[in-house]
Structure formats: structure tokens, C-alpha cells
């Protein structure tokens, strides 16, 4: 069997939440002509298309977005797993936003991607500088770690995983990026 490559997007192929650099996109584009690869990300399809140039996106065997809960081949969605968060979880998250010791609050704290939630105390709309400030603050406060622990305790059927620099990804247990391996294995065996 030929080699198959699986790449995470944020922090691997691109700087966190930013587009692929021009130099790297040229390198990766040339590399992708002779290799079989898949992309996996916690981001939704729109953000992924902002980060990855279309000519690389289209060469991927598939792109798994929202932690593998959506699969795309080119512009066509192949599947989607729905997730409806319970209201008491939403209330818990708002309580964490309102009672955080971090002074930065920007907006877009709870992003419902319909297949998962992405939660951020500082807010998804923060600037790169605010993102870095929060990330440094969280290293010592362990705020995200403690919130994730609270989610896992209060909702044992859900998983909460620290994502990137400012957020927590929340989804049904087992509906994480590892689920993509089964799809890839089935296609190549």
C-alpha cells in the first residue's frame, strides 16, 4: 500500500486561525501532486477554505472539518453528524464567560457548528494580540483545563478538548478527529 498522509490544519499546515503562508503553500502544492493526503481540522468548512488554498483543498482525498463530523470531497459534503447541545450545557458555558477572571471579553463565545460546539471565554472575535494574551494567561490559570474538566464531569456523554490557543471543542464522545481513521482505512483497504 502506498503511503497516506493525514494533516491537521491549525498549527500544523497553517499558523493558528491564519491562512497558509505563501512559501509553504507553494511547497505543499508541489508535494501534494505526488502524494495521497487528507486534511483534518476542528474548524468549519468556511474557516478551512480561508486557511487552505483551493488548489490544495481540491487535491486532498477528503477534508474532514468540525473534528471529523463533516467530510468534504472538493465542494461536495459527503456526510455530517448533527449535535444538539443541551440547554444546561449552554447555561454552564455562559456562566463561565460571565465569571471568568480573565479581563478580555470580545464576543462569539459559543460557536454552534451544528456538529459540535466551540467555546471560548475570550471570544472567537478577538484579535491575534488578544488571542496571544489569553493564551499566555491560560497557561498559568488553567481556565480551559478546568472548564473542560467540568464539562466532562457534568455531561459524561460529551467530550471537551482544549483546541488551539483560546477554545474548547465540545462534541459527543467518540466524535473526535480519530473517527476519520475509519473512513480512510475503509477507502484504502
Predicted regions: what they are:
Residues 18-109:
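Active-site phosphate-binding/coordination module
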Residues 7, 42, 65, 112, ...:
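Conserved strand-loop elements at the edges of beta-sheets that form or border functional pockets
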Residues 12, 69, 124:
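Short glycine-rich anion-binding loops that position phosphate/pyrophosphate groups of nucleotides
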Residues 103-189:
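Conserved acidic, metal-coordinating active-site core of Asp-based
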Amino acid at each position: 500500500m502506498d503511503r497516506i498522509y493525514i494533516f491537521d490544519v491549525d498549527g500544523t499546515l497553517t499558523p493558528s486561525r491564519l491562512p497558509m503562508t505563501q512559501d509553504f503553500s507553494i511547497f505543499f502544492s508541489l508535494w501534494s501532486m505526488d502524494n495521497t493526503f487528507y486534511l483534518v481540522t476542528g474548524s468549519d468548512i468556511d474557516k478551512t477554505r480561508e486557511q487552505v488554498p483551493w488548489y490544495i483543498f481540491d487535491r486532498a482525498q477528503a477534508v474532514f472539518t468540525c473534528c471529523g463530523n463533516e467530510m468534504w470531497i472538493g465542494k461536495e459534503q459527503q456526510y455530517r453528524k448533527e449535535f444538539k447541545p443541551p440547554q444546561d450545557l449552554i447555561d454552564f458555558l455562559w456562566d463561565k464567560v460571565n465569571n471568568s477572571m480573565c479581563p478580555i471579553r470580545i464576543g462569539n463565545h459559543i460557536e454552534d457548528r451544528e456538529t459540535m460546539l466551540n467555546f471560548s471565554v475570550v471570544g472567537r472575535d478577538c484579535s491575534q494580540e488578544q488571542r496571544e494574551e489569553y493564551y499566555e494567561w491560560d497557561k498559568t490559570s488553567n481556565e480551559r483545563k478546568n472548564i473542560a474538566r467540568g464539562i466532562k464531569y457534568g455531561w459524561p456523554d460529551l467530550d471537551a478538548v482544549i483546541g488551539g490557543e483560546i477554545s474548547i471543542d465540545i462534541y459527543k464522545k467518540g466524535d473526535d478527529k480519530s473517527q476519520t481513521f475509519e473512513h480512510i482505512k475503509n477507502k484504502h483497504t
